[in-house]
Amino acid sequence: MSTDLKFSLVTTIIVLGLIVAVGLTAALH
C-alpha cells in the first residue's frame, strides 16, 4: 500500500469521525 493512499484513507476516516461527532452532539442538544 502506498503512503499517499494510506494518508488519504486516514484523513477520510478522521473527517468522517468529526462529522459523526458533530452530528451526535447536535442531536443530543
UniProtKB/Swiss-Prot annotation:
The keyword Cell membrane applies. The modification N-formylmethionine is found at M1. The chain crosses the membrane at residues 7-27. NCBIfam families: small_mem_YnhF. GO terms for biological process: cellular response to hypoxia. It comes from Escherichia coli (strain K12). Keywords: Cell inner membrane, Cell membrane, Formylation, Membrane, Stress response, Transmembrane, Transmembrane helix. One of its GO terms (cellular component) is plasma membrane. The keyword Transmembrane helix applies. Induction: Constitutively expressed, repressed on shift from glucose minimal to glycerol minimal medium, induced in low oxygen (at protein level). It is found in: Cell inner membrane. This is Uncharacterized protein YnhF. InterPro entries: YnhF-like.
